[in-house]
Amino acid sequence: LFRIFHGITLYTFHSISYKKKVLQDIVRSKEKGADFIFMCMHAGGQYNLLPDRYTCNLMRFLLNTPLDMVIGHHPHCIQHIVKKKNKVGVFSLGDFCPYPKCASAELASPDVFPEYSIVFHVYLDENKVATNSFLQKKTFTIVKSIIGKDKIARVYPLYRLIELEKD
């Protein structure tokens, strides 16, 4: 959608008319030559381990459009992904750098692990756009946010933290 608007477009999905507008924009992006269309979806309840019905319906709607991938955020904890043919929908990658002891983090149940997040790696092959098989590989890295003695939050790959503990 960036190619159409050359900026950020915000949508509110609380009515059918907005869904129609989003669909028109996605179709227009394809018509203007977009090779890949990724959407960032800000939806879902904070610290919910599972997406709510509204968010699931929204994801289903988006994956039935010409979008290639939906990356969700807002719940502040990791949620699952869904696949539909060559498309991927990520409900929530977590809270990349939460600040423990902040008001919203205090509301989180300990079993949602808000200090952990996922960095999602997507490998594309632009030579396979015509066959719609350009999404070659998906991998991820688990990261953890840690507040240092200097009160600065730093994000570390979990594997690196495990290696540091061995030393």
Model-derived features with residue positions:
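Acidic, metal/ion-coordinating pockets
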Residues: 1-167
